[in-house]
């Protein structure tokens, strides 16, 4: 797996952490925009737009809350990437997998919700897509594949007509990425280091303001408990920004445990 340092990833619009555990807030956290990846995007963009004319799969591997889907969508919507492909579509697999549902989602994304598509069988959907692949250079984003068997089931649906088509795939499982590999090595998203987590927390809480040494000491402890996950950092930014005092921060540090990571992952899964 290819690895790269985690640097300069910034979060926009920190959420109100007081309501972070409601379903509506969970949705907003799940969709929280994480921007940056400035050192990563150019390399992956090149894999999408340059190189062999053979169909290739660019797999992005990482834990829940690490920013896989955000990076994939950033690439998918990149102007230079969009201009390279004739047609584009995206879908999310999730744990309840259905080949027909995935193919239907892709076709609907390509055909502007053609109502007739819902009546097609799996075989008809596959055939309809195969006809598109033969005349169009395509880019497909498949988010959140959990098992290699799912990719093995989907793979025959994507024709290689040697026209530079690409598939972006996100997964938590190295096995899935290895199974999907054609030419490009799977890309392994790095975890934040503690100092990077603190840098991000400090930036989002204080902006251009300074941070006292006492708060920095507690802040480093909080950053450590975020376990290197951007989404975990989002969960605490709102609280820290509301109470910029040592007492409040120590209370957060005291109550913040390993559950923060499972909370972040649960929001990704729901």
PLM feature segments, named:
Residues 1-270:
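Intracellular innate-immunity NLR/STAND receptor architecture
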């Amino acid at each position: 797996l290819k690895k790269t340092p985690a640097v300069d990833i910034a979060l926009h619009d920190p959420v109100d952490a007081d309501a972070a555990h409601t379903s509506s807030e969970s949705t907003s956290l799940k969709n929280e925009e994480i921007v940056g990846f400035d050192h990563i995007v150019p390399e992956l963009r090149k894999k999408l737009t340059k190189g062999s004319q053979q169909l290739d799969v660019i797999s992005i591997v990482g834990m829940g809350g690490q920013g896989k889907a955000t990076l994939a969508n950033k690439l998918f919507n990149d102007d230079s990437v969009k201009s390279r492909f004739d047609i584009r579509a995206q879908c999310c697999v999730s744990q309840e997998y259905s080949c027909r549902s995935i193919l239907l989602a892709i076709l609907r994304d390509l055909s502007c919700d053609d109502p007739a598509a819902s009546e097609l069988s799996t075989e008809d959907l596959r055939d309809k897509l195969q006809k598109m692949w033969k005349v169009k250079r395509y880019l497909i984003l498949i988010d959140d594949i959990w098992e290699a068997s799912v990719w093995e089931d989907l793979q025959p649906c994507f024709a290689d007509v040697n026209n530079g088509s690409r598939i972006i795939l996100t997964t938590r499982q190295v096995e899935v990425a290895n199974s999907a590999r054609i030419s490009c090595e799977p890309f392994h998203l790095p975890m934040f280091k503690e100092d990077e987590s603190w840098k991000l927390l400090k930036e989002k809480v204080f902006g251009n303001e300074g941070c006292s040494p006492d708060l920095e000491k507690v802040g480093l402890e909080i950053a450590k408990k975020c376990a290197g996950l951007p989404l975990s950092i989002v969960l605490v930014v709102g609280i820290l920004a509301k109470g910029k005092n040592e007492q409040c921060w120590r209370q957060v540090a005291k109550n913040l445990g390993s559950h923060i990571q499972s909370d972040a992952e649960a929001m990704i899964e729901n």
